[in-house]
């Protein structure tokens, strides 16, 4: 059965409400926390969008439908900073369990920081963005045109290899970024194709914006109404036994 993951980056304040909304529909979420943002010891990468509080992060952790994973300390891909953020998270959560890590901007250099380095530092998994292959430069343009024109099939084709490689070598996760001008129908189509082809689906999200939100026009935001429609749709598919809502770690801990 297809497994679907909603993976939120940064721990922005609006993501708290979005994750609570998802939980209302029984949809699980992974929250990748940039610890310095939450501590308010570094300016957020999202500009006018503040971070969650530590108390909100812990409340979500206690929810049962939410996984907490790392996103570095100051939103960079420096290994020392990544480990620092992870250790801070472990302290907040009072856990010795391995936590996953999602790369900021999905720009982790695996030549500089190979996966074995993360395994040795007790990380459960590493997540970047889409699966890269020789067609990736062309796909970038197809995605842009598809988002502007609302094309579903061409957009899906650019992520077909990503869906086929959501879990690479049992450790390295890939996902589909959900961007501002992606329609609900485009994301629904991708989910349906994952079910049709019996693959998993991991969606990467950031701010979920209601009207008047400071980031409602930011590329990495998505509209509240679209997100709620997605949660309703995932719930309906789960009720029908067509997919299962899971956490990022569930893709590893089979």
Language-model segments: what does each one mean?
Residues 6-7, 70, 80, 162-169, ...:
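Glycan-processing catalytic domains of CAZymes
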Residues 15, 53, 78, 82, ...:
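Aromatic/hydrophobic pocket-lining residues that form the small-molecule binding cavity
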Residues 10-13, 48-56, 223-228:
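Aromatic- and glycine-enriched glycan-recognition loops and surfaces
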Residues 24, 90-93, 125-128, 187-196, ...:
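C-terminal domain-boundary segment and adjacent tail
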Residues 25-147, 200, 204-216, 251:
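Metal-dependent polysaccharide deacetylase catalytic core of the NodB/CE4 family, i.e.
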Residues 17-21, 113-117, 190:
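A short acidic, amphipathic alpha-helical/loop segment
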Residues 1, 135-175, 218:
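Membrane-proximal basic amphipathic "stem/tether" segments
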Residues 1-14:
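Boundary/entry segment of secreted carbohydrate-active catalytic domains
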